[in-house]
Amino acid sequence: MSTKYLAAYALASLSKASPSQADVEAICKAVHIDVDQATLAFVMESVTGRDVATLIAEGAAKMSAMPAASSGAAAGVTASAAGDAAPAAAAAKKDEPEEEADDDMGFGLFD
């Protein structure tokens, strides 16, 4: 499901008890969102006749069931990849000449 259509449905439900697909489409077009008719039809089929508060509660329950952090194995892989890249970055940094300090470039803002 696309969250932009769900947000438009929630907004439309503030003015109507049961917003139509045309109502949601009008809100999307008002904020210059390109509307994919197939996706919008699927979203409307899934949420029509349901209370927005219930949809939010169901979504919150599903989100709380998802893991919040990545696994330790994936973190180890990224740490080793970052460790390999560090010496290469240090070597590249040594090749660059140091730039001289610009000082205040003659502006004297706080004199």
Curated annotation (Swiss-Prot):
Sequence segments annotated as region (Disordered): 86-111
Pfam families given in the database record: Ribosomal_60s
GO biological process, one term: cytoplasmic translational elongation
Keyword match Transcription regulation: no
Keyword Oxidoreductase included in the entry's annotation: no
Keywords for this protein: Phosphoprotein, Ribonucleoprotein, Ribosomal protein
Domain of life: Eukaryota
Gene3D superfamilies from the UniProt entry: 1.10.10.1410
Molecular function in Gene Ontology: structural constituent of ribosome
UniProt PTM: Phosphorylated.
Any one GO cellular component localisation term in the record: cytosolic large ribosomal subunit
Subunit and interaction comment: P1 and P2 exist as dimers at the large ribosomal subunit.
Similarity comment: family membership: Belongs to the eukaryotic ribosomal protein P1/P2 family.
Described function: Plays an important role in the elongation step of protein synthesis.
Protein name: Large ribosomal subunit protein P2-2
Source species taxonomy: Eukaryota, Discoba, Euglenozoa, Kinetoplastea, Metakinetoplastina
Recorded name of the encoding gene: LIP'
